[in-house]
Amino acid sequence: MELKVLNIQGAETGEVVTLNDEIFAVEVSEHAMYLDVKAILANRRQGTHKAKTRAEVRGGGKKPFRQKGTGNARQGSTRSGLMVGGGAIFGPQPRTYDQKVNRKVKQLARRSALSAKAAAGQIVVVDDFSFEAIKTRPVADMLKNLGLAEKKTLLMMPHHDNVVSTSGRNIEKLNVMVADQASTYDILNSQVVLFQKGALQKIEETLG
């Protein structure tokens, strides 16, 4: 697949790049993407939820009333899970939600995500650029010129650029990442993947 390279003004530079078919034209594996995204979202969970059991809540040491003769159901503690103020029965406890996905499956998932974006015409290539100062306006203007101002955009960079990443931080629908760090979730969670031209080589080194 060939794509025209645009500049930050949104005009064609006259240059054309060829996307690697091994990355941008593979058969899309929805199952691999499902496994990877599921693991990514699960691994974000802290797992620090906790409810106290009847052994951990305060009070309840004394039998509330005698065993027989009151007409009430027998109770040995006011902190039973059946009582108001009692401990939780099988309540949530701290745990890890981490899931492991094999490297080959992760690679396939990322290739599938990029291939799906390419097939849908949701990949744009812009010539390499840099800004002198940390300002939101130049990045916002670039997105507007490219027709991406209202679209959820993933900007893929060839390397970390503090000026660009910080400048784009205040733009709600923009996510700036180094190409080899973008996950399957990041790709699928965007409407358009905007590649700096140099980032294509970076992604080929990672997934090629």
Swiss-Prot record:
Gene Ontology CC: ribonucleoprotein complex; ribosome
Region (Disordered) location: 49-78
UniProt keyword annotation of Iron-sulfur present: no
Biological process terms in GO annotation: translation
Keyword hit for Ribosomal protein: yes
Bias-annotated ranges (Polar residues): 69-78
MF GO annotations: rRNA binding; structural constituent of ribosome
InterPro entries (alphabetical): Ribosomal_uL4 (IPR002136), Ribosomal_uL4-like (IPR013005), Ribosomal_uL4_dom_sf (IPR023574)
Gene3D superfamilies linked to this entry: 3.40.1370.10
Keyword terms of this UniProt record: Ribonucleoprotein, Ribosomal protein, RNA-binding, rRNA-binding
Tree of life domain: Bacteria
Assembly mode: Part of the 50S ribosomal subunit.
Homology family: Belongs to the universal ribosomal protein uL4 family.
Function recorded in the entry: One of the primary rRNA binding proteins, this protein initially binds near the 5'-end of the 23S rRNA. It is important during the early stages of 50S assembly. It makes multiple contacts with different domains of the 23S rRNA in the assembled 50S subunit and ribosome.
Full protein name: Large ribosomal subunit protein uL4
Source organism (scientific name): Chlorobaculum tepidum (strain ATCC 49652 / DSM 12025 / NBRC 103806 / TLS)
Gene: rplD
